[in-house]
């Protein structure tokens, strides 16, 4: 048998190597690379091109329309190279592979293949896993293994890797070869294993289906009769389903793990996978059968149960049967074929394992104790356990109509109440989380009126009670009441409050005065009334804050008046688009030190004098330039000097002696009446508002100027020493 399997594997490997035309597709920018298999003509063409050009795969790929360089290289090295050895493995090669695997491990196949001439990594890997691995069984196939392969293949199909997990020591390749070469023909043509599995089926099923309820209760401690309108929990109406499920679980009676097995943990994991696959098979068979699940409370198992034991108990609970009680009309319903494997049969093979034996000691198999339903705890809260369609439901929804029935526990008259759902509940139905009602907590943020008036269940997020805020003063007043403008908060942005999320169908019953966001709304008043002083715009605030952060607090620096004059000249020149000022040529050596302050003030006043172009508009008669220069004095600043145009004052010079100054003062006295007689007339063309304000041409400014001039005319200085300076 082993020799036959070996020859079949070698033949299959060789066939796969010769005719495996599936190559991984390499993406390229231009060539539409083909996914098709390599043809015989393409293989011959590759051989000729390699003989001619060598292993220059760029040149070789140019002769193919839809093949890339990588594809040509892969095809040559893996299939077409004459250096490849495709024959059977020799003893020397096998020994070399074993040594290299012990050295590099069972995953470095590319490195291992470099030490074996003519072999590639794929060949070395398959040789090790299929033949040279000491864990691989080379003995003949047993009938029990055939039964496992048959039942697993019927459930999972050609998933050989999953089936190999159920058979320790057998590889997926060997199982596939055994099925294709031997078992498939026997099962389909000769009826292999079908007679063996069906021989004991009629007597067992007939005895269990025709047994009385008391007999079922004595045999199965988890048997619970329910009402007739509720379908049974684990009833199968078709004999074929019973046969398939029984066949899938018949191998559980055989222990797969020995107590002295060095790979005991691995076997235990494989057994767990076996039970999980059986559970999936049962679920797949139950769903199309149309049977519904009975809602009931389950008992709490101890926390000391391991994960493996929980899987086993799920299997045990899934296959415990529930029968029906005859209906009220007295007609006996047709009993279906049911499947109820014994708990001892399932758990007996596990008693030989120390890990399972310690766990099984925690379970009392006494039927008297297990049949006492009053001893079980039936919680009304949801269990955090993972729910599967075949497990007893751990949760009772408040929306379910619960039915209670009295059950005889062990025939001694003790009754227990078992909760079951309404027959209108669909199969395996579990209400969504969003539809489950929750308990009403007294600490929710409800007003006393709402809490006392109705018992509405909140479906939104509870909101914390907010602290007192001065903004809540707006709640007390009516909408039409006058607001106190002195105590208003200086905020222009409304504060976003937390909204209570509620369903659209829920009516909002909170009084208007208690609304949470009522105090955070900006009142509709004029913003100009909220503050007297102007406020700095936000961009300037940000800029000032950045400057203070970088350079420290800002400080006011007094600038010389000459810089102010230059700024005013620049602004006026930009607005009027004319150069209205004529620079004076100053002779600093002619000015005494005591005149420095007076000259500075004169420069400031000089910038406020009208342009020379406005002389015609005013209609005034001005003096000659030489008369102005004679009447100008550096120590005196008469009022009439303000009305002298700028062009006539540019020839001012410093006097060298006091006598000359006195003479100029007398001339200035003669000039004053002439200047005082100047009448201001209305301008031909009205000035703009800005120019009128800047140049003092408004009506109020003209009146005040005339009154000031008349007032100053009454002042008669007695001497030059008694002159007083008037600084505007």
From Swiss-Prot:
Sum up the protein's function in the record's words: Transcription factor that specifically recognizes the sequence 5'-YAAC[GT]G-3'. Acts as a master regulator of male meiosis by promoting expression of piRNAs. The piRNA metabolic process mediates the repression of transposable elements during meiosis by forming complexes composed of piRNAs and Piwi proteins and governs the methylation and subsequent repression of transposons, which is essential for the germline integrity.
Region annotated Negative regulatory domain, chain positions: 296-534
User: Quaternary structure?
Assistant: Component of the DREAM complex.
Name of encoding gene: mybl1
Keyword terms, alphabetized: Activator, Differentiation, DNA-binding, Nucleus, Repeat, Spermatogenesis, Transcription, Transcription regulation
Note down the stretches annotated as region Disordered.
Answer: 1-31
What is the scientific name of the source organism? Xenopus laevis
One Pfam family of this protein, by short name? Answer: Cmyb_C
Q: Name one GO molecular function term.
A: RNA polymerase II cis-regulatory region sequence-specific DNA binding
Q: Does the keyword Transcription apply?
A: yes
- UniProt-annotated location(s): Nucleus
Q: Which residues bind DNA?
A: 57-80, 109-132, 160-183
What is the protein named?
Myb-related protein A
Q: Where is this region: Transcriptional activation domain?
A: 230-293
């Amino acid at each position: 048998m082993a020799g036959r399997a070996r020859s079949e594997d070698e033949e299959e490997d060789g066939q796969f190597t010769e005719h495996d035309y599936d190559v991984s597709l390499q993406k390229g920018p231009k060539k539409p690379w083909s996914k098709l298999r390599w043809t015989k003509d393409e293989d011959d063409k590759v051989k000729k091109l390699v003989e001619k050009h060598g292993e220059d795969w760029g040149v070789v790929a140019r002769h193919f329309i839809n093949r890339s360089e990588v594809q040509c290289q892969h095809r040559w090295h893996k299939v077409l190279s004459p250096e490849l050895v495709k024959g059977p493995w020799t003893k020397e090669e096998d020994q070399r592979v074993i040594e290299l695997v012990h050295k590099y491990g069972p995953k470095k196949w590319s490195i291992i293949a470099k030490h074996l001439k003519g072999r590639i990594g794929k060949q070395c890997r398959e040789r090790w896993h299929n033949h040279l691995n000491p864990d691989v069984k080379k003995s003949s196939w047993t009938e029990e293994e055939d039964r496992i392969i048959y039942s697993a293949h019927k459930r999972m199909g050609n998933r050989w890797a999953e089936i190999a997990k159920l058979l320790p020591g057998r590889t997926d390749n060997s199982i596939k070869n055994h099925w294709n070469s031997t078992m498939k023909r026997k099962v389909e043509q000769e009826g292999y294993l079908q007679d063996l599995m069906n021989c004991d089926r009629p007597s067992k099923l007939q005895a269990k289906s025709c047994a009385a309820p008391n007999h079922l209760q004595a045999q199965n401690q988890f048997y619970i009769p329910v009402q007739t309108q509720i379908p049974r929990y684990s009833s199968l109406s078709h004999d074929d389903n019973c046969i398939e499920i029984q066949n899938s679980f018949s191998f559980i009676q055989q222990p797969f793990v020995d107590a002295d097995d060095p790979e005991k943990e691995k076997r235990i994991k494989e057994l767990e996978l076996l039970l999980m696959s059986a559970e999936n098979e049962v679920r797949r068979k139950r769903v199309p059968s149309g049977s519904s699940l009975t809602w009931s409370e389950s008992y709490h198992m101890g926390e000391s149960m391991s994960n493996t034991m929980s899987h086993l108990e799920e299997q045990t609970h899934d296959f415990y049967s529930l029968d029906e009680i005859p209906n009220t009309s007295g007609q006996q319903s047709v009993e279906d074929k049911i499947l109820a494997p014994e708990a001892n049969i399932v758990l007996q093979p596990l008693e030989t394992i120390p890990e399972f034996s310690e766990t099984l000691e925690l379970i009392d198999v006494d039927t008297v104790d297990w049949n006492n339903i009053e001893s079980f705890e039936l919680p009304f809260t949801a269990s955090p356990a993972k729910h599967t369609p075949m497990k007893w439901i751990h949760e009772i929804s408040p929306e379910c109509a619960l039915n209670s029935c009295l059950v005889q526990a062990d025939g001694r008259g003790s009754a227990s109440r078992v909760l079951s759902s309404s027959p209108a509940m669909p199969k395996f139905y579990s209400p969504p989380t969003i539809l489950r009602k929750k308990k009403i907590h007294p600490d929710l943020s409800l007003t006393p009126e709402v809490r006392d008036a109705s018992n509405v269940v909140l479906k939104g997020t509870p909101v914390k009670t907010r602290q007192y805020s001065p903004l809540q003063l707006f709640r007390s007043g009516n909408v039409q009441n006058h607001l106190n403008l002195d105590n208003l908060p200086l905020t222009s942005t409304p504060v976003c409050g937390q909204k209570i999320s509620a369903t659209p169908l829920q009516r909002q019953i909170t009084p208007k005065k208690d609304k949470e966001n009522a105090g955070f709304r900006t009142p509709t008043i004029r913003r100009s009334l909220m503050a007297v002083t102007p406020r700095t715009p936000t961009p300037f605030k940000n800029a000032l804050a950045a400057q203070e952060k970088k350079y420290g607090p800002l400080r006011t620096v007094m600038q010389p008046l000459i810089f102010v004059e230059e700024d005013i000249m620049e602004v006026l020149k930009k607005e009027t688009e004319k150069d209205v000022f004529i620079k004076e040529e100053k002779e600093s050596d002619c000015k005494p030190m005591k005149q420095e302050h007076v000259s500075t003030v004169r420069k400031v006043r000089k910038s406020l004098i009208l342009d020379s172009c406005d002389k015609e508009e005013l209609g005034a008669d001005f003096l000659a330039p030489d008369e102005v220069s004679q009447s100008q004095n550096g120590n005196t600043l008469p009022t009439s000097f303000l009305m002298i145009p700028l062009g006539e004052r540019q020839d001012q010079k410093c006097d060298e002696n006091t006598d000359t100054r006195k003479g100029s003062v007398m001339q200035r006295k003669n000039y004053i009446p002439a200047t005082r007689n100047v009448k201001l007339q209305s301008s031909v063309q009205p000035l703009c508002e800005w120019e009128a304000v800047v140049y003092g041409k408004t009506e109020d400014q003209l009146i005040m100027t005339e009154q000031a001039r008349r007032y100053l005319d009454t002042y008669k200085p007695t001497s030059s020493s008694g002159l007083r300076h008037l600084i505007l």
